[in-house]
Every structure is written in structure tokens, then in C-alpha cells.
Regions:
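Bacterial Sec-dependent N-terminal signal peptides
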Residues: 1-24
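Long, intrinsically disordered, low-complexity, charged/polar and glycine-rich segments
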Residues: 21-238, 242-245, 285-298, 376-422, ...
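Beta-strand elements of repeat-based all-beta scaffolds
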Residues: 207-211, 238-241, 304-308, 327-330, ...
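Edge/loop elements at the starts and ends of beta-strands within beta-rich repeat scaffolds
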Residues: 232-233, 300, 322-324, 347-349, ...
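Solenoidal tandem-repeat scaffolds enriched in leucines and small polar residues
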Residues: 250-328, 610-664
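Low-complexity, serine/threonine/proline-enriched polar segments
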Residues: 277, 381-405, 488-522, 610-612, ...
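Long, internal scaffold/assembly segments composed of regular secondary structure
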Residues: 323, 329, 333-368
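Amphipathic hydrophobic-ligand
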Residues: 335-342, 363, 472-474, 611-613, ...
Length: 922
């Protein structure tokens, strides 16, 4: 008997991806706050958990739904960047995110794509230098009038009237299993995706749909919003439909009505500003504008209740007192409970344990979690970046604008927003206890920028791994920056000017003249309004500081093992010197975030300093496109009885001079779509060198890979994909159909060269089978007849007859359990004698009947099938293989424990030939 002992280990990774085409870093951050749930899901895309941002990946796997290559992982992910004032515990607890599905969140810029009122005009996007000033004379074609229309488009659907125009691309953040990025849309339906990829988002209105590179469809049919549904909303994944249309995974939610205020999600927001108003007489007035303290913005976020597929389902059960606090996950297969996960929490806010139970309701294993106390609640005191910096604000009506001291002895009576390391770490995860009862502890420290200045947010400092007896097994500690200086690149230093928006108030009044009343310019007031948070983005990839160099040390104090040095690509954003009026811009001219955080190099040395492994990557930009935007800001406000002069202010010298030719301030910026990919990779491992060079197509797929070994010999692999054939394909051809169904991932042609000599070639031919497109033939060099031929499929897209070159027999299959499992295989014969009625009945049934299986078994003695070999498969209610019957009638049985794990394998006499034990501690 063979015994196997298996141990489950929690994945804690220091991730450092190599290929640029998998990047999901956004080109530009969102300006509008999405719902808390969307923020929690999206941040694992825009704030990647790698050492470039000082983070490690902490994931608790719960369950994975797998259907025809589609994987829906259900997991708890922890983001160890620190807790902000507007973070919410949501389903799992502070810092944790339930990942089970996906979201598409929309934020309007300038005019929304979903305005139902007003009169839409063509987009107005010009270079600032080309916008004509002082042409507001009543002409319908003046540039300054077009800016009026742009500002009008930025209103909500409830207040907009008259003509409007767009000037910026709206943004959709999308995140679903194995895919994330941004999709941009302009009012004229011009669109693009960041990064350029084979994933396509379309129908991006009130029911967005995405297709992945295999042609699988993801539908997002349930929505939440903050009430202004035309400018800010999130859609949630409701269906995944396989490319062959044979399988659908359903996501069910409890939708929340706006009247159910106790069920809404209330996100903390800070709105109040502090203004200085300087008039012509040299008098300065100051005022607080807006509601002080921390207020709330409400979202009607739906609650995930169930994920189901063909009799299998995952149920999510919540607290009866806290509707969004997840208490239990129950996993069923074919109606049978196979396992459950129960959560223990403190105050519904901190996850203390995740306990896994089998079908017999007995605990199998668990994870435990400990934290650095609790973060302050309510009217908390915060630093410049939104992290906690003290026990509480001095008053529930405190002014959260920083207490800056400004030129001319001006002061703002706001809060002290400086960083406090101790309070920033409150509520952070510090320990995970594994099912083995071993555990890992985590130590964090604040980010450090140039010159050692501390910045908001946390980075990993140290991880210690202990066994169940509390003995240290391994230690990892991290040194950041060039030469381990501890310093990275701060995105922006704190500057009061970044918090300030400026405007100009102009009084217009009537005065008697020789020919009647005339319009005169009266009082002029300059306004500086200071906000609680900077208008310019202080984050890149979600972090206040990024690190181009990080060194990881490993070992124990008694036995150091060496170190690993990581080097990442790092580019600063490119900023304008100012707006049209010379003020600070909110958005950089070009954001280079999409090129940052790529693994440039990795060097591993042992404890003697000897290099045992090294990797060096060279990158290049591909498929780059820059899209111009025009951001327009209100600046001059003409008020008073003669305010109508603003419609023709250019005809009045005083007003045209005072406004400097425009009522607005504006600037350009670009959104970049492209990819930053590995061009060449050099690797040294165990004394062996190799170099790999890559070339890509317009969708970022590798079309050529050249491997050069230590001796200088080259092997070249060239691939062609759907888009490479589609360019020259006729309309209606298989390549045309695959292209428009977004089936891009299959390599249709693979050629292998040794030097210049072709040594191997494989061609994969696809066919439109009516309801779906699937593989028909596999051909190889010198065999222009098919080497593998797929002759037929069932209605679920499963192959039913396959033949291979060199084998003088076909292999036929019957699928059961609604196309989820093979129940019979025949070699050298066919199942035609069963007839289509029985075959279809068996395939469609939730479980084949005993009578139908007996008919299939009887084929073993059918004289017409003499010489053929039949194998049958039997499954339990959870679709685990229960019995295998070989062509000679030999039976092998499989038994499982209450958690659905394989426990033992028995021969036909009941003798155990293999057993499995799982290394958990109770």
C-alpha cells in the first residue's frame, strides 16, 4: 500500500511578474469615488501586491469553480497597505476582500455617456494653444462658447439643460477572474482598452459585457450607484457563458432598494473646504464651505447570495444583525453539501478565524488571524493621505483641511494631518495561524521617500515563519531603495498648492449712460479654496512611494541563507508647468504608471555572496497610442444684475481683460494605451546561461520566441493567432468568425526552427460546428492529413469522437451529468448502436439512471463490438470518481473523506492500494 501525506500551505507571495502583456496597471486613476465594494476589488489591479509597492500577496483559498477552462476562484485576499478612514469591513473584515466574481465600475469625465437630457454635440478636444480666447461675441462657433457646452456636460442628469459637449474619455475599471484593466469611451463612441489586450469590453451601457481571449462571455447585470446613476455606478458579474455556449455560471444577488437605508453601504466622505476671499480693497475674508466633519455617501450595493452551475452551487450566508457581514460559505455539488467555511469575527469588523467543515459537520482545519488592536472608528483623525494618525478628531464637526501655514501669515484652522506610525498600524494583520498550527507573523513600517521622509501607507518589513511548537523556521526581512538606503521615490511631496482650487468672482452691474443703461465691472474677488485632500494625485499604482530596488534576506539568525535583489522599472509621470492660467494641474500630461513595476532584474546570492541565479529583462513599448483629452474647470463667475454679460463678455473691454479672455481654466492630458513588454530576457541558473528574445503582435501576443543557449545555438518558435490570419481572411471565413467572437488565445500555427532550418510545424484547424467554434484537426509537419481529428461534439461542446494518426482506431465518448463528466469510452468501436435518444438522455441527465448504465455495460458482450475496448466511469453525488471499470471488467474504487478529498483507492477485492492522509492539526 502506498501512503501519501499532504499538507496545505497558505499562499503568501512576493510576486514579481515578468511579461508586460499580463500587466493590469492602469494608465490613469479614477477621479470619481466608486462604491466601496468596487474599490476593494479593483485595488488588487491598480494597487498590485508586489515589492515595487512594498507589499506581499496574502490569500486564503476557499473554493474554485472550474468549467471548461474558466476558473472562478473564491478567496479572501488581504491588502496590507494600511487602513484608510473610508475603508469598510464589508463581507469579511477590515483589509480583507471577498473575491468571488467581478465588477465593472464607471466614472464619467466631462459629459457622461449616459445623460438622457440635454442636446448632445460632437466632442470638443483641442490643444490649449489652439483654443481661441476672447471670442465670446455671440457667435455660435466661438471656442469659448464650446467650453460653456463642455462645462454643461459635466452636470448631473437631474440638472443638465440645453446643449452639451464632451472633452474627456470616460473610464470603466473592469476586474474579473484573471483579467483587469481599464476601458475608455468618448461621446462619439471612440474607445480603447488599457492595457491593449485580447480582452474586450462592449455594450458598456447599463448591461456591460466582456469577452476574454477564449471567447467566453462575462455579463454584468446588477448595478449599484451613489444615486447619480449617469455619472458613477458599478455593475456586478451575473453570468459567465462558455465560448461553446454549453455552460453558464450564474451569480445571484440580493438587490437593495434606496428606501432600505439600513441596508445601504455608507462610505465616509469629507467635503468641507476652507476659503480665502481677497477683494479690491485688500480685505480678506475666510470661511468654511460645506458640511464639516465626516459625512457619508450611500450606495445600494447588491449582496452576493449564490454562485451556481448545473446543480452545483456556492451559498453565501450573512449575519442576521449585520446584513453585509459574511458568516458562512456552503458548497454543494449536485445538491449535496460537501464542505462549508464558517467565519469568526470581532464586532463584524475583524476576521478572527476561517474554519473549514466537511459534509459531516466536523471541523477539518482552520486559519486563525491576529491584529494590532483596532483602528479608531467614527470621527477619526487622519494624515495627509487618509490613514489614521490619532485616536479621534477634536470634534465631530472638525475641519479636515490640513492646518497649513500659508504665505502672508495666513493659517487654516484645520487638523494636524502629519503622519503617525503607531496609529497607522492600528488594526493591521500581524499573525496568521495555518491548519498545521504553524504560523507567520508580519511586521510593517511606513513608506519612506527621498531623504528618508515618511509617507502614508505601509510596506512589509519582516515575516517570520514558526512551526507548531513556536520555533522559528524561516525569517524574511526587506531592505528598500538603492544601496538599501530605505528610501524609494515619493510620488509627490506634500504641498499646500496641491490642495488649492482657485476662482475669480466678477460683479456686473447696470449704470446709466448717454444711450441708456451700460454694463460696468464692479467688485472683483479672488478665491482660494483649500480642500481636505490634494487635487493632484499623490499615489501611483495605489502607493505613495514606489521602489525600483528591493532586497529580500532569508534564513534564520543562526543560519542566514542569502539574499535576493529585485529591480523594477520606474518612470516618473510627466507634468505640465501649469494650466492655461498657470495653476497646478490635477492630472499629469502623461502618466507612465503602465510602464512601472515590471521586473527588470533579479539576483540571488547565497550566504557566501556567490551568485547562484540571475535574471535580467529588457523591455520595450509596443502598440502605443496616446489619446488627447481637454479638462475644463470653471474659473470666472460673473454675478450681479448684469451677469448676462458673460454670454458676450469679449465685447466689453473691462470684462475681456479681467477674465483674460475666458471664463474657464483648462489644460490637456493624454491617456496612453499600450504595453511595456519583455524584449529580451537573460537568465543564469546553476552555471547555465540562456537568452530569450520576444516579438509580439498588435494584441500583445508572443509571435516569436528565440532561445539562445550557452553554446550560442538558437531555437526559434513562431506562432500565429486569430488576428494574424484575420487580416487577410475573407468575410465569413473561420478566422473572421473567430475574430469577431473574440477567440484569440489558440495558437493556430506553431513553427519550430533550429537556426534557419524548419524542424517542426503544427497547424490547429478550427471549425464552426453551428452553436460554437471548436478544434477540428491538428496537423503536423510532413503529415498534411490530420494527426488528430475531432469528428463530433455533443451539445455541451464536449468532443465525442476523436481519431489520431498512427492509431488504427477511433475513440468515442459518452458524457453524462449534464456534460460534466465522461461516463463511457470505447476504443475501436462506436456507441452508434445505443441510438441518439439514449445517448442524449444520458448526457442531459443530472445523473445517468442505473438502467441506462446497464445498457452501456452490456455493450461489452455485443458481438458487433468484438475487439473494441470499453471503459466506464461512475461518480458519487458530488461528481467525484467513485468507480472505474476497465475493458477487462476490473474495477477500481475510490473513497473520499467528509471534506471531499481522496482518502483511499481500492482494488476489486476491496484491498487498499493507496491511502492519503492530510497534515492538519486540531
Amino acid at each position: 500500500m502506498k501512503k501519501r501525506i499532504l499538507t496545505i500551505i497558505l499562499g503568501i507571495l512576493c510576486t514579481a511578474g515578468m511579461h508586460g502583456q499580463s500587466s493590469d496597471v492602469t494608465s490613469l486613476s479614477q477621479l470619481t469615488t466608486p462604491s466601496p465594494k468596487a474599490t476593494m476589488v479593483d485595488r488588487f489591479g491598480y494597487y498590485p501586491t508586489n515589492l515595487y509597492t512594498g507589499l506581499v500577496d496574502i490569500t486564503i483559498p476557499i473554493h474554485t469553480i472550474e468549467v471548461k477552462g474558466i476558473k472562478i476562484p473564491i478567496e479572501f485576499k488581504y491588502h496590507a497597505s494600511g487602513l484608510k478612514y473610508d475603508d469598510l469591513p464589508m463581507e469579511v473584515g477590515y483589509g480583507w476582500t471577498l473575491m468571488a466574481g467581478g465588477t465593472v465600475s464607471y466614472s464619467a469625465r466631462a459629459a457622461s455617456a449616459y445623460l438622457t437630457k440635454g442636446e448632445k454635440g460632437e466632442p470638443f478636444i483641442k490643444e490649449v494653444k489652439d483654443i481661441v480666447k476672447n471670442d465670446k461675441t455671440g457667435s455660435l462657433y466661438s471656442d469659448q462658447l464650446q467650453l460653456d457646452y463642455v462645462i454643461n456636460g459635466s452636470k448631473s442628469d437631474y440638472t443638465i439643460q440645453g446643449k452639451y459637449r464632451d472633452s474627456e474619455y470616460d473610464v470603466y475599471n473592469f476586474s474579473f477572474p484573471e483579467h483587469s484593466g481599464q476601458y475608455y469611451l468618448l461621446e462619439d463612441n471612440k474607445e480603447f482598452t488599457v492595457p491593449v489586450s485580447t480582452t474586450y469590453l462592449y455594450g458598456s451601457g447599463y448591461t456591460p459585457v466582456a469577452r476574454d481571449e477564449r471567447g467566453n462571455e462575462y455579463q454584468f447585470g446588477v448595478r449599484d450607484s451613489d444615486g447619480d446613476i449617469a455619472r458613477n455606478f458599478t455593475y456586478y458579474l451575473t453570468k459567465v457563458i462558455s465560448a461553446d455556449k454549453g455552460d453558464t455560471i450564474h451569480f445571484s444577488y440580493q438587490e437593495i432598494n434606496w428606501g432600505a437605508t439600513d441596508k445601504l453601504v455608507h462610505r465616509p466622505v469629507i467635503e468641507a473646504t476652507y476659503s480665502f476671499k481677497d477683494n479690491m480693497q485688500g480685505t480678506t475674508q475666510s470661511s468654511i464651505d460645506g458640511v464639516t466633519g465626516i459625512t457619508r455617501k450611500s450606495f445600494n450595493t447588491p449582496i452576493l447570495k449564490e454562485i451556481s452551475h448545473k446543480g452545483n452551487r456556492v451559498e453565501f450566508q450573512y449575519s442576521s444583525t449585520e446584513i453585509r457581514s459574511l458568516e458562512q460559505i456552503r458548497i454543494y455539488q449536485q445538491g449535496t453539501l460537501v464542505k462549508s467555511v464558517r467565519l469568526a469575527k470581532t464586532d463584524h469588523a475583524y476576521l478572527d478565524a476561517a474554519r473549514f467543515y466537511g459534509s459531516d459537520n466536523k471541523e477539518i482545519y482552520s486559519y486563525g488571524f491576529e491584529y494590532n488592536g483596532k483602528r479608531p472608528e467614527g470621527y477619526m483623525s487622519i494624515d495627509y493621505w487618509g490613514y489614521c494618525n490619532g485616536p479621534s478628531a477634536s470634534s465631530p464637526h472638525a475641519l479636515y483641511v490640513p492646518n497649513f501655514t500659508l504665505p502672508n501669515n495666513r493659517t487654516i484652522p484645520g487638523l494636524n494631518r502629519s503622519l503617525n506610525e503607531a496609529y497607522m498600524q492600528k488594526g493591521m494583520l500581524t499573525k496568521i495561524v495555518y491548519p498545521t498550527k504553524g504560523y507567520t507573523t508580519f511586521t510593517y513600517e511606513p513608506h519612506r521617500g527621498q531623504n528618508g521622509v515618511l509617507y502614508g501607507g505601509l510596506r512589509i518589513k519582516e515575516m517570520n515563519v514558526y512551526n507548531e511548537s513556536g520555533n522559528l523556521q524561516e525569517k524574511k526581512w526587506y531592505k528598500y531603495g538603492l544601496n538599501e538606503s530605505g528610501n524609494g521615490r515619493a510620488i509627490r511631496t506634500v504641498d499646500p498648492n496641491d490642495y488649492c482650487s482657485q476662482s475669480y468672482l466678477l460683479e456686473a452691474y447696470w449704470a446709466p449712460g448717454f444711450e441708456g443703461a451700460i454694463t460696468l465691472l464692479g467688485e472683483r474677488t479672488r478665491v482660494e479654496a483649500y480642500h481636505a485632500f490634494p487635487l493632484s494625485d499623490y499615489f501611483q499604482q495605489g502607493s505613495t512611494v514606489v521602489y525600483s530596488c528591493v532586497t529580500e534576506y532569508m534564513g534564520t539568525p543562526a543560519a542566514p541563507e542569502g539574499k535576493t535583489e529585485y529591480r523594477f522599472s520606474d518612470f516618473m509621470d510627466e507634468w505640465y508647468y501649469g494650466t492655461m492660467r498657470g495653476n497646478r494641474t490635477e492630472i499629469p500630461k502623461w502618466s507612465n504608471a503602465w510602464k512601472c513595476g515590471k521586473l527588470v532584474g533579479k539576483t540571488v546570492t547565497d550566504n557566501s555572496g556567490k551568485i547562484v541565479y540571475s535574471l535580467s529583462n529588457t523591455y520595450e513599448e509596443i502598440n502605443r497610442r496616446d489619446y488627447l483629452n481637454l479638462r475644463v474647470l470653471s474659473y470666472c463667475n460673473i454675478y450681479g444684475p448684469a451677469s448676462g454679460i458673460k454670454e458676450i463678455f469679449s465685447t466689453h473691454t473691462d470684462f475681456s481683460t479681467a477674465t483674460e479672455g475666458s471664463l474657464y481654466d483648462y489644460y490637456n492630458y493624454y491617456i496612453t494605451s499600450g504595453e511595456y513588454v519583455v524584449k529580451e530576457s537573460k537568465e543564469f541558473n546553476d552555471g547555465v546561461y540562456k537568452t530569450v528574445r520576444y516579438k509580439y503582435n498588435e494584441l500583445g501576443q508572443i509571435i516569436e520566441e528565440t532561445l539562445v543557449n550557452s553554446e550560442g545555438n538558437e531555437q526559434i518558435v513562431r506562432k500565429k493567432y486569430t488576428c494574424d490570419f484575420w487580416k487577410d481572411a475573407m468575410s465569413g471565413s473561420i478566422y473572421d468568425k473567430m475574430y469577431w467572437k473574440n477567440i484569440h488565445s489558440p495558437a493556430l500555427e506553431i513553427s519550430v526552427y533550429k537556426g534557419e532550418a524548419l524542424v517542426g510545424k503544427t497547424t490547429n484547424e478550427y471549425k464552426d460546428w453551428g452553436d460554437f467554434i471548436a478544434l477540428q484537426n491538428v496537423k503536423q509537419l510532413n503529415y498534411y492529413e490530420p494527426r488528430i481529428k475531432y469528428q463530433s461534439y455533443d451539445k455541451y461542446g464536449n468532443p465525442t469522437v476523436i481519431s489520431k494518426d498512427g492509431e488504427f482506431e477511433e475513440v468515442s465518448y459518452i458524457w453524462g451529468h449534464q456534460g460534466q463528466r465522461v461516463i463511457a469510452e470505447i476504443r475501436g468501436g462506436s456507441f452508434d448502436t445505443l441510438g441518439p435518444v439514449l445517448t442524449d438522455r444520458v448526457t442531459s441527465a443530472v445523473s445517468p439512471s442505473s438502467a441506462d448504465m446497464a445498457i452501456i455495460e452490456a455493450l461489452r458482450s455485443n458481438p458487433s463490438l468484438e475487439g473494441s475496448r470499453i471503459t466506464t466511469y461512475y461518480y458519487d453525488s458530488a461528481l467525484n470518481l467513485k468507480q472505474l471499470v476497465m475493458p477487462n471488467g476490473t474495477k477500481t474504487s475510490y473513497e473520499y473523506d467528509s471534506f471531499g478529498r481522496l482518502a483511499c483507492v481500492k482494488d476489486q477485492n476491496g484491498k487498499i492500494i493507496e491511502s492519503y492522509q492530510y497534515n492538519y492539526k486540531q
